[in-house]
């Protein structure tokens, strides 16, 4: 006989999950520790549930099975990434194990967790106390059949109970990443299409026949205000498109406009500040030459949380920050001078500056160095005068 904790951890491992994240909390901590022991690896724990969720989602989009182990309260913290991940979809199976401390013995408060899951619209099942191993295994195939993240709701009071199970041979992922910006770039360009696809997936209908929109050609297909931004950023992207990595992640910020032709410089995008954890997930899935693009506001709002994860995992991530001291995507609200520099002080050895982002020679020199080194690089392009 084995405990439910042990069975869940074995099921995750045997399902072939390559990237498994966890933020400490009742239930998830115990299962994660057991998973680390089974896999003979000391996987790092994450500090923030939105980041942990997004890392796993990035790995799934890049073609590797993944899982996130978090408390129900943590799912609430990750909600922005959750709803955007449903619009972006998945490639390989992505299972979110949500641990429900129903009586709040180790949590902030008691709340209606099923209502949260239903409101987020993430497909979920409650773990039943029979054939636990199969239920966790099936969750990965369910995710892959829907091409969506799915959740399994687990009562923490059940984790010490005992069951028998028959282990299966460890699965090998056979999913390959394919660039698809119409599906994977969440933002103002394709929301109606992505919503129709999501509704079809949730209702069990065929979504492949839904008419796909045509990506805008930049700058000609854009409103005048966006054309001005494109002209400002065009010299940098004319160089970046030649040096870009295997996967480039973006934020829902103005730089993600360059996902469209003829630049094709962004591949995946979910929420503001999500580019860095998405890129970490892609790196962990095997795409080592990965770039994350972000605006200064997006980076300060949430992106910097991902830097901690990249450092503790020793990932040689490449990050490009567009520093214009404003929240350009939401109307140009000013960002106080000096805050970006203060945040980056702790990462000074990795920081490189593009002082004149209209000078293609300087751009080429800085980006070339960043792309070639086997270390993290944080490139800051100075658009404060633009």
Where are these regions (language model features)?
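Generic structural signal for well-ordered, non-membrane alpha-helical segments
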Residues: 1, 5, 24-28, 49, ...
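Flexible, low-complexity linker and terminal segments
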Residues: 1-18, 123-254, 354-386
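Short active-site oxyanion
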Residues: 16-20, 41-42, 247, 266
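A structural motif
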Residues: 17, 245, 287, 315, ...
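Thiamine diphosphate
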Residues: 26-119, 123-125, 131-144, ...
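Short secondary-structure boundary/capping segments
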Residues: 111-114, 167-170, 262-266, 308, ...
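Acidic, Ser/Thr-rich peripheral helices and adjacent loops at domain boundaries
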Residues: 169-179, 267-274, 335-347
């Amino acid at each position: 006989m084995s405990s439910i904790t042990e069975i869940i951890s074995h099921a995750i491992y045997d399902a072939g999950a390559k990237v498994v994240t966890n933020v400490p909390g009742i239930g998830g901590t115990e299962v994660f520790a057991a998973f680390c022991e089974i896999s003979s690896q000391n996987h790092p724990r994450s500090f923030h549930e939105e980041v942990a969720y997004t890392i796993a989602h990035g790995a799934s989009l890049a073609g590797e099975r993944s899982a996130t182990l978090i408390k129900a309260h943590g799912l609430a913290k990750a909600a922005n990434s959750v709803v955007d991940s449903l619009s972006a979809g998945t490639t390989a199976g992505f299972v979110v194990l949500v641990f429900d401390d129903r009586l709040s013995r180790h949590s902030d408060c008691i709340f209606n967790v099923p209502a949260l899951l239903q409101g987020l619209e993430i497909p979920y099942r409650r773990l039943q106390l029979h054939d636990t191993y199969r239920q966790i295994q099936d969750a990965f195939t369910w995710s892959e059949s829907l091409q969506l993240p799915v959740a399994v709701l687990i009562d923490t009071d059940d984790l010490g109970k005992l069951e028998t199970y028959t282990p299966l041979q460890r699965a090998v992922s056979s999913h390959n990443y394919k660039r698809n910006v119409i599906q994977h770039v969440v933002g103002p360009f394709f929301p109606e299409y992505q919503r129709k696809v999501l509704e079809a997936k949730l209702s069990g209908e065929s979504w492949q026949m839904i008419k796909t929109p045509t990506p805008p050609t930049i700058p000609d297909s854009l409103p005048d205000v966006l054309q001005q931004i494109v002209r400002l950023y065009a010299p940098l992207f004319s160089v970046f498109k030649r040096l870009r990595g295997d996967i480039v992640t973006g934020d829902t910020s103005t730089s993600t406009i360059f996902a469209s032709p003829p630049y094709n410089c962004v591949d995946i995008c979910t929420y503001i500040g999500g580019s860095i954890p998405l890129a970490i997930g892609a790196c962990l899935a095997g795409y080592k030459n990965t770039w994350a693009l972000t605006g200064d506001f997006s980076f300060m709002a949430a992106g910097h949380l991902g830097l901690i994860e990249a450092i503790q995992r020793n990932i040689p991530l490449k990050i490009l920050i567009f520093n214009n001291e404003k929240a350009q995507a939401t109307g140009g609200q000013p960002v106080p001078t000096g805050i970006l520099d203060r945040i980056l002080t702790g990462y000074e050895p990795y920081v490189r500056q593009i002082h004149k982002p209209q000078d293609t020679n300087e751009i080429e020199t800085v980006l070339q160095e960043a792309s070639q080194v086997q270390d993290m690089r944080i490139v800051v392009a100075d658009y404060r005068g633009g």
